[in-house]
């Protein structure tokens, strides 16, 4: 086993509780507890964003993962209810260089450590996250474990090695809604970045594979009536809502395992309805069109990934560990965006059907707003498909 020492943050020795991080390859990181006591196992990944830790922690796409934040300071702005992307934290655990015990933000109602403890999330700080990131970048994302109760590296390592790999894992059932509902949360926030038109009167059915709240906000801000349905909803039930379009949401896990979602997307393609997919929804839509997916070495998780194809580059927020294989796309599918860091497929559309998707997150939260126009494109497809009223 390889022992990698951690750093200490500026706290008294009496306040520190020892914690341990062990990776599947035997690497050991010593640090200090932050949040709940206990042991968690998950896929260890890194996020390079400098802001938006609360949105990351509550993003359902991170279900089953232990997230290491490369930015060294975490928690300075506390936690507030408005910035949550779901009802609770979705990560398995948190890794940080330093976590602020005191926060300064007029919107915050609690500290990050208190929030983690409240929701039973195990965290570790005092870790050399730069060394950890470089290690994961070289070897690839892998399972790991954080513990405040098992401080013997060999014992924790045994638990880590027994855990299933993310590849082949279906986590959608853990994050999808258990019943249909209409999205009704107000969208008029003083800090919202764009005000879209609100007179479309279009109905969108959003298939919830782990949807973020800000996606629903953006759809609603364009005047859409948004009905959210569980991931395994049959197409007959989807069509009963008489949608003008169907949205396939983001979510966690291996897209190849979401068989119900892929078969539903295949059936939706036969209806001619406008379809829009984001992240996991993009992968599911690509799979429904005959493409194959594969696991990335360490994934794309951050707020500054450049995407484009020819004349225009968009800076995007991303969070995924799988991608569509470009050479598996059929002649009827056109690649619209590439991730310009590694040339993986970042967007596609059907040449003859009103169907498109992107691998990244145009809704931001957190992230740049370069790609918000995609919601407008989806609305335009639905509007153009509607019959013209008789005068």
From Swiss-Prot:
Record carries keyword Amino-acid biosynthesis:
yes
Give yes or no: UniProt keyword Ligase: yes
Q: Which reaction does it catalyse?
A: hydrogencarbonate + L-glutamine + 2 ATP + H2O = carbamoyl phosphate + L-glutamate + 2 ADP + phosphate + 2 H(+)
Q: Where does L-glutamine bind?
A: 61, 251, 253, 280, 283, 319, 321-322
Task: Write the record's keywords in alphabetical order, separated by commas.
Answer: Amino-acid biosynthesis, Arginine biosynthesis, ATP-binding, Glutamine amidotransferase, Ligase, Nucleotide-binding, Pyrimidine biosynthesis
Q: What is its EC number?
A: 6.3.5.5
| Family, as annotated | Belongs to the CarA family.
* Assembly and interaction partners: Composed of two chains; the small (or glutamine) chain promotes the hydrolysis of glutamine to ammonia, which is used by the large (or ammonia) chain to synthesize carbamoyl phosphate. Tetramer of heterodimers (alpha,beta)4.
Q: What is this protein called?
A: Carbamoyl phosphate synthase small chain
Q: Which organism is it from?
A: Synechococcus sp. (strain ATCC 27144 / PCC 6301 / SAUG 1402/1)
* Recorded name of the encoding gene: carA
């Amino acid at each position: 086993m390889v022992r990698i020492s951690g750093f200490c943050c500026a706290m008294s020795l009496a306040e520190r509780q020892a914690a341990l991080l062990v990776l599947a390859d035997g690497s050991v990181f010593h640090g200090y507890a932050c949040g709940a006591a206990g042991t968690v196992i998950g896929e260890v990944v890194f996020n390079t964003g400098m802001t938006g830790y609360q949105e990351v922690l509550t993003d359902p796409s991170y279900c089953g993962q232990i997230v290491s934040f490369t930015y060294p300071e975490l928690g300075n702005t506390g936690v507030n209810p408005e910035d949550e992307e779901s009802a609770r934290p979705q990560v398995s655990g948190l890794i940080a260089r330093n976590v602020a015990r005191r926060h300064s933000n007029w919107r915050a109602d609690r500290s990050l450590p208190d929030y983690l403890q409240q929701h039973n999330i195990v965290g570790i700080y005092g870790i050399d996250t730069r060394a950890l990131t470089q290690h994961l970048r070289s070897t690839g994302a892998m399972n790991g474990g954080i513990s405040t109760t098992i401080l013997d590296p060999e014992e924790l390592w045994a638990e880590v090695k027994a855990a299933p790999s993310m590849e082949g894992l279906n986590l959608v059932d853990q994050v999808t809604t258990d019943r249909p509902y209409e999205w009704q949360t107000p969208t008029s926030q003083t800090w919202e970045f764009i005000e879209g038109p609100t007179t479309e009167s279009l109905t969108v059915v959003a298939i919830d594979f782990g949807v973020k709240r800000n996606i629903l906000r953006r759809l609603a801000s364009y005047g859409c009536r948004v009905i959210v349905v569980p991931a395994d909803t049959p197409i007959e039930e989807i069509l009963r809502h008489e949608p003008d379009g169907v949205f396939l949401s983001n979510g966690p896990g291996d897209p190849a395992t979401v068989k119900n979602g892929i078969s539903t997307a295949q059936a939706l393609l036969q209806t001619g309805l406008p379809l829009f997919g984001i992240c996991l929804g993009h992968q599911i839509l690509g799979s429904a069109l005959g493409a194959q997916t594969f696991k990335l070495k360490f994934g794309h998780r951050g707020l500054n990934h450049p995407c484009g194809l020819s004349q225009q580059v968009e800076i995007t927020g991303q969070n995924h560990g799988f991608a569509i294989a470009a050479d598996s796309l059929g002649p009827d599918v056109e690649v619209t965006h590439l991730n310009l860091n590694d040339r993986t497929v970042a967007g596609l559309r059907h040449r003859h059907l009103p169907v498109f998707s992107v691998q990244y997150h145009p809704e931001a939260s957190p992230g740049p707003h370069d790609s918000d126009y995609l919601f407008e494109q989806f609305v335009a497809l639905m509007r153009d498909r509607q019959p013209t009223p008789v005068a």
